[in-house]
């Protein structure tokens, strides 16, 4: 069957073509049965991995030096295990990207990226040349599709033009690490970070001291 079609708002042009014998009529109503077919939408950035602890300027007066004690801790704040294969970690201090291998971060667990993995058993070797700035840097975690999963810009001072901008100070060579207070809240706010109560070096690979039910202090 040869059909000629003329557009409603057009000149004298005609469109010529053939009917497909398998064509079906358009139906404006559709029904679906999830028992037969269903899909589940997942946002491409739904991975709930957060930068949870940063030891960017270890305290040399405690015998902890940058090349041996710098680390970044990631926390899986979701309910599913996540394979980090092909994920990237960027650090503006050195302006390069670290690529993760076939590493699975279980739900509710921690992963340490260490400048010296011998200091932290079970950690990932970040490389001795990949230092963390002692003053300010932007840390970015991207998934295999290069989408940003988490990003933090830490500082050792205050930005008068930004709310919640004063970063904790004892993590700047005072013996504490920089610990996230609430992984469900925006971790790019300085107000969501606190100096670790554990001195020196914080709590790499375990629950943050700021989130612990234990009470830290000294007896009189």
Task: State where each predicted segment sits.
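Primarily marks secretory-pathway-exposed extracellular/lumenal segments that are disulfide-
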Residues: 1-50, 196-220
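Activation on beta-sandwich/Ig-like modules and their edge loops
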Residues: 10, 42-189, 196-199, 213-214
């Amino acid at each position: 069957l040869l059909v000629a079609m003329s557009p409603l708002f057009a000149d004298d042009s005609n469109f010529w073509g053939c009917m497909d014998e398998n064509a079906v009529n358009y139906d404006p109503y559709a029904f679906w049965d999830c028992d037969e077919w269903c899909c589940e939408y997942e946002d491409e950035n739904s991975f709930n991995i957060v930068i949870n602890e940063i030891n960017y300027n270890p305290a040399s007066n405690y015998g902890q030096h940058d090349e041996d004690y710098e680390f970044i801790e990631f926390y899986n704040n979701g309910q599913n295990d996540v394979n980090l294969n092909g994920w990237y970690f960027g650090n503006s201090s050195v302006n390069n990207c670290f690529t993760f291998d076939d590493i699975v971060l279980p739900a509710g667990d921690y992963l340490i990226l260490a400048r010296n993995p011998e200091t932290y058993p079970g950690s990932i070797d970040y490389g001795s040349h990949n230092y963390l700035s002692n003053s300010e840097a932007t840390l970015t975690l991207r998934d295999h599709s290069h989408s940003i999963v988490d990003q933090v810009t830490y500082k050792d001072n205050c930005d008068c033009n930004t709310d919640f901008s004063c970063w904790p100070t004892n993590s700047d060579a005072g013996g504490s690490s920089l610990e996230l207070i609430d992984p469900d809240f925006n971790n790019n706010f300085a107000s969501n970070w606190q100096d670790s109560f554990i001195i020196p070096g914080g709590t790499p690979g375990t629950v943050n001291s700021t989130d612990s039910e234990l009470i830290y202090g000294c007896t009189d």
